[in-house]
């Protein structure tokens, strides 16, 4: 029995949840999100609560049950509050700049790295070494932050690279001199 799938999700005030045969649409203050629902999962919204049920007890149905419930919870939170990921850039000469709808990163390569910002995402730079990724879709915010981090992951010796704000990098000791 999926405990996550059986959760009742409270609909915050000011949000509108529309359920179609294979779709759930959530409209809120920050925008609108849409999620396709598999045929084995049934979503019901009434009296300010969203519930999900599955048609059978096949393993795949059980897996989808919890996943869809969590995705809908993320949608409810996203259109009401939004999501935010913060990244930090460490390293001499490493910095970021916004040029139109592109994020330009100087990360020690022979050329600047340009990242096109997708629709529905806002990126702000309080400092040239700090990037804030914001949006209503939890999946998209996480994906954009991961893509930016992948351009130069933090290395274990000096910690240079792009890391999440509260990420702890396990450091290694360098080569020791001869005896």
From Swiss-Prot:
GO-annotated molecular function: rRNA binding; structural constituent of ribosome
Gene3D superfamilies with a match to the protein in the record: Ribosomal protein L6, alpha-beta domain
GO cellular component: cytosolic large ribosomal subunit
Keyword flag rRNA-binding: yes
Disulfide bond as UniProt keyword: no
Matches recorded under PROSITE patterns: RIBOSOMAL_L6_1
GO BP field: cytoplasmic translation
Keywords: Ribonucleoprotein, Ribosomal protein, RNA-binding, rRNA-binding
Function noted in UniProt: This protein binds to the 23S rRNA, and is important in its secondary structure. It is located near the subunit interface in the base of the L7/L12 stalk, and near the tRNA binding site of the peptidyltransferase center.
Quaternary assembly: Part of the 50S ribosomal subunit.
Family recorded in the similarity comment: Belongs to the universal ribosomal protein uL6 family.
Protein name: Large ribosomal subunit protein uL6
Protein encoded by which gene: rplF
């Amino acid at each position: 029995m999926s405990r996550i799938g059986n959760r009742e999700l409270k609909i915050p005030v000011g949000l509108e949840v529309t359920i179609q045969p294979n779709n759930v649409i959530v409209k809120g203050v920050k925008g609108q999100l849409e999620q396709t629902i598999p045929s084995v999962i049934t979503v019901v919204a009434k009296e300010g609560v969203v519930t999900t049920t599955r048609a059978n007890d096949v393993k795949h149905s059980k897996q989808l049950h919890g996943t869809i419930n969590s995705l809908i919870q993320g949608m409810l939170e996203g259109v009401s509050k939004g999501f935010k990921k913060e990244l930090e850039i460490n390293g001499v000469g490493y910095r970021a700049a916004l040029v139109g709808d592109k994020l330009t990163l100087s990360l020690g390569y022979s050329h600047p790295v340009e990242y096109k910002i997708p629709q529905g995402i806002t990126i702000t730079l309080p400092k040239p070494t700090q990037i804030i990724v914001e949006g209503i879709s939890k999946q998209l915010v996480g994906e954009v932050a991961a893509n930016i981090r992948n351009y130069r992951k933090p290395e274990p010796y000096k910690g240079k690279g792009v890391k999440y704000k509260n990420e702890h990098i396990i450091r290694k000791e360098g080569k020791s001199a001869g005896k």
